[in-house]
Amino acid sequence: WAEGIHKFFITDDNFARNKEWESIFDRLIELREKEKIPIGLLIQVDTLCHKIPNFISKAKRAGVTRVFIGLENINPDNLAVAKKRQNKITEYRKMLLAWKAQGIFIYAGYILGFPGDTPESIRRDIEIIQRELPLDLLEFNILTPLPGSEDHKILWNKLVDMAAALNKYRLEHFVRD
């Protein structure tokens, strides 16, 4: 911060499940409130973080101004394919409103290209999201069987044609038929 840097991205893929989240937030709160160090944070969390007592309110006091949440999808069948049974659209709104109540910018990720997706189902899901979910920014990514992932192994074993160039596996390229 002495060099003018006061915005940070904590690159824990799910800060809410970090066993030390509360002690980290407590120290950041102390730096902000007692030592008046202007810290702003972006963190990544899961869709159930709002159920952890005091997590969101402490996040605000610790300097969280933006939160990234991997919604993955709203279609229950797609969430099952992604093995994200904990992600439920019925919880999404409640969780998002808890962040909104603290004035925190919500940046979410959404995956397109599940086996059951069609242009019509994607349009319908986007309309539901626009109507029901209070998001500030929604980023769309293509379902990508990243090398080393379970999806990639399954497709490889089924001899599905996939891109040989590893630089194509960046969530924005189609890498299979």
Predicted regions, residues:
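Conserved SAM/AdoMet-binding glycine-rich loop
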Residues: W1-Y107, L112-F114
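Conserved strand-to-helix beginnings and helix N-cap segments that scaffold or border functional pockets
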Residues: W21-E22, I52-P53, T118-R123, H152
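Alpha-helix boundary/interfacial micro-motifs
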Residues: I29-E30, G63, N87-I89, K94, ...
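C-terminal accessory regions of radical SAM enzymes
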Residues: E120-D177
